[in-house]
């Protein structure tokens, strides 16, 4: 696994269930097309899997 993950919010959270909104917010994403970098670990991977239809992930 890569050391870092570059996560970009590709779709809006408008109209999404509250748990998905909270997950996106917890990842540090507020606006569409915003990108954040996180360490690659099981917790982050789990959050990405939960909102995989809203984000894109690039390994660094």
From Swiss-Prot:
Query: Per the UniProt entry, what species is this protein from, by scientific name?
Result: Bacillus pumilus (strain SAFR-032)
Name the GO terms of the biological process aspect.
translation
PROSITE patterns assigned: RIBOSOMAL_L30
Q: Which gene encodes it?
A: rpmD
Entry keywords, A to Z: Ribonucleoprotein, Ribosomal protein
Q: Which family does it belong to?
A: Belongs to the universal ribosomal protein uL30 family.
Q: Pfam families under this entry?
A: Ribosomal_L30
- Mind telling me which GO cellular component terms the entry cites? cytosolic large ribosomal subunit
The record ties this protein, via HAMAP family, to:
Ribosomal_uL30_B
As one GO molecular function, the record gives: structural constituent of ribosome
Q: Look up keyword Ribonucleoprotein and say if it applies.
A: yes
Know the name of this protein? Answer: Large ribosomal subunit protein uL30
Q: What does the subunit comment say?
A: Part of the 50S ribosomal subunit.
What the entry lists under Gene3D superfamilies is as follows: Ribosomal protein L30, ferredoxin-like fold domain (3.30.1390.20)
């Amino acid at each position: 696994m890569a050391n870092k993950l570059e996560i970009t919010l590709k779709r809006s959270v408008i109209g999404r269930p509250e748990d998905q909104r909270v997950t996106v917010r917890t990842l540090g994403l507020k606006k569409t097309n915003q990108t954040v970098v996180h360490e690659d670990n099981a917790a982050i991977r789990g959050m990405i899997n939960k909102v995989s239809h809203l984000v894109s992930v690039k390994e660094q």
